[in-house]
Amino acid sequence: MRINPTTSGSAVSTLEEKNLGRIAQIIGPVLDVVFPPGKMPNIYNALVVKGRDTVGQQINVICEVQQLLGNNRVRAVAMSATDGLTRGMEVLDTGAALSVPVGGATLGRIFNVLGEPVDNLGPVDTRTTSPIHRSAPAFIQLDTKLSIFETGIKVVDLLAPYRRGGKIGLFGGAGVGKTVLIMELINNIAKAHGGVSVFGGVGERTREGNDLYMEMKESGVINEKNIAESKVALVYGQMNEPPGARMRVGLTALTMAEYFRDVNEQDVLLFIDNIFRFVQAGSEVSALLGRMPSAVGYQPTLSTEMGSLQERITSTKEGSITSIQAVYVPADDLTDPAPATTFAHLDATTVLSRGLAAKGIYPAVDPLDSTSTMLQPRIVGEEHYETAQRVKQTLQRYKELQDIIAILGLDELSEEDRLTVARARKIERFLSQPFFVAEVFTGSPGKYVGLAETIRGFQLILSGELDGLPEQAFYLVGNIDEATAKAMNLEGEKK
């Protein structure tokens, strides 16, 4: 891994010796810059525009070269607002790609796409930096071991387990709980595994970014008293940023995660919320650069852009990056090119269902639509596999019977089917769980349920031992013992 040992002071002095160009055209966030003959910058080089606007305010805009147009002109995309820029302004070619701080100094801090801290906590140690554009690890460096990553969330661990060092997609429309699930995972992983996380906020709401930061400070994931003890680094490029920043902020977060994996040899969790916004920003940039759009108006380079990001997220013999990516599904259409391209890279999918959210079952993870390549007997063991398959069969049968129930009612079902429906409704409710990060909304304390406890609970429901308990006893509880205790309380209240 190439590390650039630069300090901010020396970076400026080396810039002075580089070649200068001038702005020839500005169209929103896209700049055309003319350079002297023979002094053209390379693709992905960072350009710096410095100067003053009409009211004398200092301007410092960093752009990234995207196209070489010929006639000594390059087209670059700005990483911040282009307000105040004028034609004829001087542009410096840095001679290298964007580099961002990496290592322990990033923990507990919030950065923008350029690796600049935006949390008003003072400067960050920039002695160790790394370029955001790097090639994926070679095949020979990759680690091929298969092991489960326990999350403490029942529905995930039982039916669609995550792979350590794998890529997981969180699919769902607006408002079904993707961000809450991500916050719970960060919380559980920091507490149960002591792992380092990097959170990339790509094109989402600034308010959510702020809420997440406050939540992390409250839960101790970010340690305010001793910032170096924190377990997460945050990189934000929010909805109000230009498309260039939203397109590159994922790479900034990934670069920080790669350092923890390759140099510190740690297991890292990389959260990207939302990978769809990465595609959306790429689509905006593609249109601004004048490329012909592809299906549904997306960029023609959609698969290439997605592949270059996803192939860097992998496990090597040094360490692993387990990535959890929220995927917004436009109009709940899973065949849209953005989610469809993302599917190709994933080891597991956690699909959130609006129907379950409407029933009040949280996390609203669809047990039949969510999948995992890890759910095989040779990986998870026979007991886990059998239990998961029986749970799915019971829920599938219930789904098939729902039309009959809606038209004819429960009484028209056979005795066996009525039993299946009763157990399926208990399973459906037992798949819900109180979250630590949602304690303020639900009023019930969060629960972390180990995999062995989860399997035991569902085996008891399937065996029929708990057929006599009311189904509401299984709603929003942790392990099965809590459900039986809740049933006794409900009985006591009736008397």
From Swiss-Prot:
It is found in: Plastid, Chloroplast thylakoid membrane. GO terms for molecular function: ATP binding; ATP hydrolysis activity; proton-transporting ATP synthase activity, rotational mechanism. It comes from the Eukaryota. GO terms for cellular component: chloroplast thylakoid membrane; mitochondrion; proton-transporting ATP synthase complex. Its main location: plastid. The keyword tRNA-binding does not apply. The keyword NADP does not apply. It is a peripheral membrane protein. It is an enzyme of class 7 (translocase). CDD domains: ATP-synt_F1_beta_C, ATP-synt_F1_beta_N, F1-ATPase_beta_CD. Its EC number is 7.1.2.2. It catalyses: ATP + H2O + 4 H(+)(in) = ADP + phosphate + 5 H(+)(out). Keywords: ATP synthesis, ATP-binding, CF(1), Chloroplast, Hydrogen ion transport, Ion transport, Membrane, Nucleotide-binding, Plastid, Thylakoid, Translocase, Transport. One of its GO terms (biological process) is proton motive force-driven mitochondrial ATP synthesis. ATP binds at residues 172-179. Produces ATP from ADP in the presence of a proton gradient across the membrane. The catalytic sites are hosted primarily by the beta subunits. F-type ATPases have 2 components, CF(1) - the catalytic core - and CF(0) - the membrane proton channel. CF(1) has five subunits: alpha(3), beta(3), gamma(1), delta(1), epsilon(1). CF(0) has four main subunits: a(1), b(1), b'(1) and c(9-12). Belongs to the ATPase alpha/beta chains family. This is ATP synthase subunit beta, chloroplastic. It comes from Barnardia japonica (Chinese squill). The lineage of its organism: Eukaryota, Viridiplantae, Streptophyta, Embryophyta, Tracheophyta. The gene is atpB.
